[in-house]
Curated annotation (Swiss-Prot):
Keywords: Decarboxylase, Lyase, Pyrimidine biosynthesis. This is Orotidine 5'-phosphate decarboxylase. It comes from Streptococcus agalactiae serotype III (strain NEM316). Belongs to the OMP decarboxylase family. Type 1 subfamily. The gene is pyrF. Substrate binds at residues 11, 34, 61-70, 117, 179, 189, 209-210. SUPFAM superfamilies: Ribulose-phoshate binding barrel. CDD domains: OMP_decarboxylase_like. Its EC number is 4.1.1.23. InterPro entries: Aldolase_TIM (IPR013785), OMPdecase (IPR014732), OMPdecase_AS (IPR018089), OMPdecase_bac (IPR047596), OMPdeCOase_dom (IPR001754), RibuloseP-bd_barrel (IPR011060). Catalyzes the decarboxylation of orotidine 5'-monophosphate (OMP) to uridine 5'-monophosphate (UMP). HAMAP family: OMPdecase_type1_B. Pathway: Pyrimidine metabolism; UMP biosynthesis via de novo pathway; UMP from orotate: step 2/2. One of its GO terms (biological process) is 'de novo' UMP biosynthetic process.
Amino acid sequence: MLEKCPIIALDFSDLASVTTFLEHFPKEELLFVKIGMELYYSEGPSIIRYIKSLGHRIFLDLKLHDIPNTVRSSMSVLAKLGIDMTNVHAAGGVEMMKAAREGLGEGPILLAVTQLTSTSQEQMQVDQHINLSVVDSVCHYAQKAQEAGLDGVVASAQEVKQIKKQTNEHFICLTPGIRPPQTNQLDDQKRTMTPEQARIVGADYIVVGRPITKAENPYQAYLEIKEEWNRIK
């Protein structure tokens, strides 16, 4: 069975911070990393080229949400960078998601963001005026993403089982908000799970940020999470 790599969220503001962080890892340890808005807006496409030159895979997490033509054109540009995975907001609708798929082509994995893991039931109903449960809203977006031809969704691990039931077992579920069991830090993630819990419910990819990037020994923290993520019981 192919070993799974946790996706490391490179939540840094510049290249210097990234290179300092990556120095904790052996060169032969090929990683799967997430580049978000802050780092991409700071460094631009050059950060993609640098990470790819090291042999690592990249999830470019920009959550595009615009009119279909703009998203199609933007995805066409991103496809040329050689990224391995990217995403759009499912709230942009089926036509926008179809346009994203057309622009990106068939190479990189394309996911739709459902509800952010920082979103609570109350926030969804009051701020977004969506009178559904979080899981029902997430599954609705997942079905629309599948209809649009996307590969899967970004959702909390708490919704994975229901998503798989309402789409299919091969529909990808990438889950942020993953925290090791010993983590007691409070942050903006509200719907979280441990790596083991995410594996048990059927998540296909997990994203881990601060428990690795803020660890005293990032490589050791990464290995422990990777071992828990791949553990067979």
